[in-house]
Amino acid sequence: MILKKAIEDAYKHGYLGKNILGTGYNLDVYLHRGAGAYICGEETGLLESLEGKKGWPRLKPPFPATSGLYGCPTCVNNVETLAAVVPIIQKGGDWYASLGTPKNGGTRLFCVSGHVKRPGTYELPMGIPLRSIIYDYAGGIKDDRKLKAVIPGGSSVPILTADEIDVKMDFDSVAAIGSLLGSGGVVVMNEDTCMVKALLRISKFYAHESCGQCTPCREGTTWLKKTLQRVYDGDARQEDLDHLLGIAFNMMGTTICALADAAAMPVRSYIQKFRHEFEYHVKHKCCDVEAAVRV
């Protein structure tokens, strides 16, 4: 509704439509609402959806800038990117770049959720320590529990342990410790979080959202979900943990888009960093967290 009203106001005041401000230039803006498919966050999947087809990502090249919507050159940008354009135009690129680090300039929207006192979306300079985001802005861990793990950039990125939260939140620094800044979606987990349950929930999501176009993704996400469900239910064997890692390894880099990698990276990092919890589930057929919280 906000975007719709903004477009209507622009037409009303002559900033859109025919002969804009008497310049002879015409421009119309249309708003199309998607159905919420995760795969349509991939730019070519989005274009396919806009054309009325299945939201299946395209092989690239050609890239949208040369052949996009209906074969025409198309600019596809995230809202966060477009929102940064206005202050850059107003104050200049040097000013914007000075807000971050020398190699990662500007600000980033960090959407903090999970077991924190003040969940929310915070616009902060690139390079701010993850610890500061959690404790200074999000108020620390809810009920003053201990921190266990943090997803630094959305559900698809490798997880970080409590010992890694002094990392600076920019692309280079997060990559240097084996994760990704991704979308800036910070998910905080306290000491009572069952990591098996957390990973199972993520794997269910990716199995549901896979478009099914590529076999490694379609079959891989399904097998990850099924195997993790067995681990959580206490019906798995120890070798199933290595089987999960094998599936994840063979999914990465083998598909048209990055959804397979998005499903595989969490599996590899959760098992590598919290393998003892997965082994406990297999051996004792229950969770070693006494009062596992909802995740």
Cite the ranges covered by each PLM segment:
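Terminal amphipathic helices with adjacent charged low-complexity linkers/tails
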Residues: 2-7, 29, 142-176, 272
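Hydrophobic alpha-helical positions that pack around
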Residues: 3-126, 138
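Ferredoxin-type iron-sulfur electron-transfer modules in oxidoreductases and energy-metabolism complexes
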Residues: 5-23, 166-295
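Active-site loop ensemble at the mouth of alpha/beta enzyme cores that anchors a bound cofactor
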Residues: 49-61, 163-180
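Short, conserved aromatic-histidine micro-motifs
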Residues: 60-87, 146, 151, 155, ...
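Short amphipathic, charge-patterned alpha-helical segments
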Residues: 126-144
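Extended, hydrophobic alpha-helical segments in both membrane/secreted and soluble proteins
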Residues: 130-133, 146, 210, 224
